[in-house]
Amino acid sequence: MTTCLRLFFRILSPIRIGCVKLRRLMFPPQAISPVLTAVAMACLAHGVVWAQSTVASTQLPTGGVVSAGQASISQAGSTLNVNQTSQRAIVDWSSFNVGQNATVNFQQPNAQSSTLNRVMDMQPSQILGRITAPGQVILVNPQGVYFGKSSSVDVGGLVATTHTAVADEYLKGQLKFNRNGATGKVENEGELRAALGGFIALLAPEVRNSGVIVANLGTVALAAGEAYELQFDGSGALSNVRVTPATINTLVENKHAIMAPGGLVILSAQAASRLQ
């Protein structure tokens, strides 16, 4: 029997969603109000230990190869620029870490542009510095993605996930992701900011936010499951995340601020059986 909890918040004014933790739960539709109370009380204050190597303050992504679309990669000091001329591009990286004093700029044609970054490293990506883009940045690392306390991401839209993107669908404009055995996690302790009407989506078997996520008139999605499909409305806004239940333990935890005035917040943790 599938167990799940999906919460949708339509935000009419700035809101701070404090401590929310979801772990393979199931409630009937009529129990939604009690669920909100139970989830709010379920927060446990505990840290997360990441098995990760030290990242130099000026560290930048390495080994970038453009495998689809048109883009070039250049570096000047502690700044790396991805100069993209096509609407969509796929870049494969040997590693994707951004040091505290480093910056990665995705120079895309417009706000509807998108760059899929596939990381081949055997270690989680550590984002401790700055990432900017007018359009969408999609960061895929099966080992995990960590946004440190010093990180600052300012983009049109962001997906950080451990799940593999379906490349053919991506190039057609669809955002679909499959776990393919990945067990890494995505955690934010920094500041993730989407452009007006944009989105921030953190997708992994385990998702934690103890930082700040901002998407004015946009969408914030924290989701845990086996597969995901991001669905957009006619205006291009993220309106839903379709989550396939996972075959492993899943968890979504929010311990700090999600601000989406006039927008939507989606929290979804789904698994294929009850937590024992």
Regions found by a protein language model. Give the residues of each.
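Extracellular and secretory-pathway beta-repeat/beta-biased strand scaffolds
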Residues: T2-Q276
